[in-house]
Amino acid sequence: METPHCQRCGGRMEMRVRHGGLRPVCPGCGFVHFANPRVAAVVFLAEGERILLVKRKVAPEQGRWALAAGFVELGEAPEAAAIRELKEETGLDGVIERMLDLTFNEADKVIVILYQARAVGGILAGGDDVEEARWFTREELPELAFASTRRAVAAWLDGSLYSAASSRAGSSRNTSSRDSSG
């Protein structure tokens, strides 16, 4: 059990059947803890025939290249998280143009939202938890981290990334591959 004490009264949680499943419940105040998935916001930014990638400085996938991404913070809209992560990891200011994809990673219990963005300012430089941020052409692509990055780049390479977004609008896909933050 990941929540040993009640966040409301501090009492010891017990596993009980509630709302159709086995969940941590506080016998003192009746609070039920729901283990909800985390949400990751991922930014796909292309300029001409180049895409922006970041080299990860930390695990998971340390040393590999990925799209700028990170977890949505409490009270933050996913679009705002995407723009924040873009700035933190690349130094670039951006605007969201549209959502491209929505997937659920069953293994890590993460909802992954992929956004198309456009750079509107800033100076390209690696920051936060990345070693480097840089533009890559199709011919220069490095080894990629995360299934969501590999899917997005593959769709960009075959020309289906932007058309796929309109056909997937309102739908989501379930993935089981490891993809904890983008």
Regions of interest found by a model, annotated:
Residues 15-20, 36-39:
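Short Cys/His-rich "knuckle" micro-motifs
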Residues 6-9, 26-29:
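Short cysteine-rich clusters marking metal-coordination/redox-active sites
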Residues 3, 23:
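Residues immediately within or flanking Cys/His clusters that coordinate Zn2+
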Residues 27-52, 71, 102:
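Conserved N-terminal beta-strand and adjoining loop/helix that marks the start
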Residues 36, 101-124, 149, 157:
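Active-site-adjacent beta-strand/loop module that shapes the phosphate/pyrophosphate-binding cleft
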Residues 46-88:
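Conserved Nudix-box catalytic region and its N-terminal flanking loop in Nudix hydrolases
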Residues 125-157:
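NUDIX/MutT-family hydrolases
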